[in-house]
C-alpha cells in the first residue's frame, strides 16, 4: 500500500493517527510497534509523515484510576470513555486536563511518542491537536440538548474558574458588582448552566477559551522539549470561523499563534454541501 502511495499515486507525505488509548494500554506500557513499522517503510520509500498526537482518547486504565476526572456537562452528568464514529479504539472524549494526574499521563505519552518517532528520517511534523475544540461538545453537536453540550463542570475546572475570576476582578466586591450578585466567598461561585444573564456567561466562555489555548501550549511545549526538529502543526474545522464558539470554546487565532504551521480541514462533500460551498442555490 505504501509503495503504491509513493510510486503510483505520487504522494510525498502521509498522515498517521496515533491514539493514546491504543498505544498506552497499561500504566507505563507503550507499544509503538505498528507505528515504527510504518515509519521504517516510509524511511525507505522517501515518504514524509505527519504524526497525529491524539490525546483525545484516554486509556481506560487511567479512567479507572481517576473516575473523578471525567468531563461533566451542565446537567452534572459525567462522560464515560467510549468509542465514537471517527475513533474505533475507544477512549473518547478523553479525560479533563484540569486534573494533574491526567495532564501528567498525557505528557508522558507525548514525550514517549516524540522520543520514538523523532529517530526516523521520515518524521516530518506533528499534528499537535486535530481540529481543536472542547472534545465532548463537538461529538454531541448534532444529537444532544444544549445542556448536554456544555463542558466542563467537574470540580477542578470549576475551581480553576474561581481562581481565574479572582485574578480578573481582584476582589469579591468587584465581581459581585459586575455580575450583580452578592457572593459570600469565591468558593460558592458556580459557572452558569442555563439561560440567564450575560456577563457571567461571557466570563465563563472567556475562561474556557483561555483554557483551550493553554492546553495547546502544553501540547506544543511537551513535544518540542523532546523533538526540536519536526514541524508543529494544527488545523481547525473548515467552518471554524462560524462554529458555535460558546460550545467549542476556542479562539482559532489565539491557537494559531502557538503553531509553526496552521491550516484547516476541508471536505467539500461532507454532511451538507451548501454549508461549505459558495455555489448559489438554484431556483
Give the role of each language-model region.
Residues 1, 21-33, 58-60, 134, ...:
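Acidic-and-aromatic substrate-binding clefts and catalytic sites of carbohydrate-active enzymes
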Residues 74-112, 116-253, 258-275:
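Polysaccharide-binding and catalytic clefts of secreted carbohydrate-active enzymes
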Residues 2-85, 103, 107-118, 215-231:
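Aromatic-lined substrate-binding rim segments of carbohydrate-active enzymes
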Residues 1, 6, 258-262:
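Extended, compositionally biased low-complexity polar/Lys-Gly-rich tracts
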Residues 259, 280-283:
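C-terminal substrate/ligand-recognition segments
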Amino acid at each position: 500500500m505504501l509503495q503504491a502511495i509513493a510510486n503510483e499515486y505520487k504522494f510525498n507525505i502521509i498522515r498517521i493517527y496515533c491514539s493514546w488509548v491504543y498505544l498506552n494500554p497499561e500504566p507505563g506500557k507503550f507499544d509503538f510497534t505498528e507505528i515504527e513499522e510504518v515509519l521504517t517503510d516510509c524511511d525507505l520509500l522517501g515518504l514524509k509523515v505527519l504524526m497525529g498526537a491524539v490525546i483525545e482518547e484516554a486509556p481506560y486504565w487511567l479512567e479507572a484510576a481517576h473516575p473523578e476526572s471525567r468531563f461533566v456537562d451542565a446537567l452534572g452528568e459525567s462522560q464515560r470513555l467510549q468509542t465514537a464514529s471517527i475513533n474505533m479504539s475507544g477512549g473518547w472524549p478523553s479525560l479533563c486536563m484540569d486534573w494533574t494526574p491526567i495532564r501528567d499521563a498525557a505528557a508522558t505519552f507525548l514525550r514517549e511518542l516524540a522520543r520514538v518517532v523523532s529517530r526516523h528520517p521520515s518524521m516530518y511534523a506533528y499534528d499537535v491537536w486535530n481540529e481543536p475544540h472542547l472534545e465532548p461538545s463537538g461529538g454531541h453537536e448534532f444529537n444532544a440538548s444544549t445542556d448536554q453540550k456544555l463542558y466542563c463542570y467537574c470540580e477542578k475546572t470549576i475551581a480553576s474558574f474561581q481562581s481565574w475570576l479572582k485574578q480578573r476582578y481582584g476582589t469579591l466586591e468587584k465581581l459581585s458588582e459586575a455580575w450583580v450578585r452578592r457572593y459570600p466567598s469565591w468558593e460558592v461561585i458556580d459557572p452558569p448552566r442555563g439561560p440567564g444573564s450575560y456577563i457571567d456567561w461571557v466570563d465563563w466562555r472567556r475562561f474556557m477559551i483561555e483554557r483551550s489555548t493553554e492546553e495547546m501550549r502544553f501540547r506544543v511545549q511537551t513535544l518540542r522539549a523532546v523533538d526540536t526538529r519536526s514541524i508543529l502543526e494544527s488545523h481547525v474545522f473548515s467552518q471554524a470561523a462560524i462554529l458555535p464558539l460558546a460550545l467549542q470554546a476556542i479562539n482559532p487565532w489565539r491557537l494559531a499563534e502557538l503553531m509553526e504551521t496552521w491550516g484547516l480541514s476541508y471536505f467539500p462533500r461532507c454532511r451538507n454541501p451548501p454549508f461549505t460551498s459558495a455555489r448559489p442555490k438554484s431556483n
